[in-house]
Amino acid sequence: MTGTRILELFGPAPEPPSELGRYRILSPTAGIRVSPLQLGALSIGDAWSTDLGSMDKDSAMELLDAYAASGGNFIDTANGYQNEQSETWIGEWMASRTNRDQMVIATKFGPDYRAHELGKGLPVNYSGNHKRSLHMSVRDSLRKLQTSWIDILYLHTWDYTTSIPELMDSLHHLVQRGEVLYLGICNTPAWVVSAANTYAQQQGKTQFSVYQGRWNPLRREIERDILPMARHFGMAVTVYDALGSGKFQSRDMLARRKDQGEGLRAIYGGEQTALEEAMSKALGVVAAQHGTESVTAVALAYLLAKAPYVFPIIGGRKIQHLHDNIQALSLRLSQEEIKYLESVGDFDPGFPYDMAGVDPADTGIATPIVAQAAPMAFVQRSKAIGYAESNKGSQTSG
């Protein structure tokens, strides 16, 4: 029997199979190590095939295998996705591959997840932000995922019907029991998250460590209040709709889809708008500057360059799309490229930012009330890993 040398145990790990396996710390308040792109499991299942396209169980297992083989360990699902098939199939996959300990699983509670079987109106307490809904959802998610813990549990949507103390006390209880490790929240106003995290900090409870919301070069509302809030509380931001509901595609890509009998999803409008077409062209220009044809990789790279602790969710049903999206991790966008992409759309931060200005730590420019007093210089905030100027001379791409 051959032993292992001590120096080998303390030596560095080998290079990953792809940049997906160059892991990152989730957030300043959550030290778990995760892949920089999260696999979205909305399409894992066949119950919603009419709207999202068909994916049988074998294809789902192959997609999960391909993600893991590329170094991916970060999967996003929810209690009701695909009428509960998403969690169930992920659980079966982890059990058959005996890889639960290698995966970081995020799931969600809040919306009614049992109406598909029980009918509308009957499962009233299977939905909501309250303790009973939370209890049943976590009980069922643990069973479907075939696990004893959930790495990240999100509140899927704030519904204004449960008090912040009830919500945060109930979530903290699950953390104390070891059934949930980290807390997240989606689709919720910044003031609610701020109030919830402040309550948690004051009461010695577990705070939210990650926020999930919509963000892409044409939908930048998250930058107004949610992104500064996340930075203040040490939260990561996981991003859905990063590819504009699949509308960020070149003319060639759209033509190939139509030739294959696969157009854009009707649930998302069916066709590109003029603005989506213009953004796709702009993404193509930046892609060409980086020697790639992938507009989706550039759309993801845009988010990875915008702020630290940002993790885009990549969905889809095809392995080739997965590999295409992984290209984003090797791209570094400059400030000029970011501004070029943002020039296509129209984002107005509005009041009070149009009066008070924005944080000089981001811009290096004094706000009006500071500038009137004296010339000032400012320490700049840390940039994202995917921001070009933050990696000059670096040969790593993690």
Curated annotation (Swiss-Prot):
Protein name from the UniProt record: Aldo-keto reductase ausK
Function field: Aldo-keto reductase; part of the gene cluster B that mediates the biosynthesis of the fungal meroterpenoid acetoxydehydroaustin. The first step of the pathway is the synthesis of 3,5-dimethylorsellinic acid by the polyketide synthase ausA. 3,5-dimethylorsellinic acid is then prenylated by the polyprenyl transferase ausN. Further epoxidation by the FAD-dependent monooxygenase ausM and cyclization by the probable terpene cyclase ausL lead to the formation of protoaustinoid A.
Further remarks about this protein from its record: In A.calidoustus, the austinoid gene cluster lies on a contiguous DNA region, while clusters from E.nidulans and P.brasilianum are split in their respective genomes. Genetic rearrangements provoked variability among the clusters and E.nidulans produces the least number of austionoid derivatives with the end products austinol and dehydroaustinol, while P.brasilianum can produce until acetoxydehydroaustin, and A.calidoustus produces the highest number of identified derivatives.
Keywords: NADP, Oxidoreductase
Molecular function in Gene Ontology: oxidoreductase activity
Gene Ontology terms: biological process: terpenoid biosynthetic process
Residues that bind substrate: H156
Quaternary organization: Homodimer.
EC number(s) given by UniProt: 1.1.1.-
Pathway: Secondary metabolite biosynthesis; terpenoid biosynthesis
Positions bound to NADP(+): 76, 186-187, 212, 241-251, 317-325
Stored PANTHER family: ARYL-ALCOHOL DEHYDROGENASE AAD10-RELATED (PTHR43364:SF2), NADH-SPECIFIC METHYLGLYOXAL REDUCTASE-RELATED (PTHR43364)
Pfam families on file: Aldo_ket_red
Active site per the UniProt annotation: Y81
Similarity comment: Belongs to the aldo/keto reductase family. Aldo/keto reductase 2 subfamily.
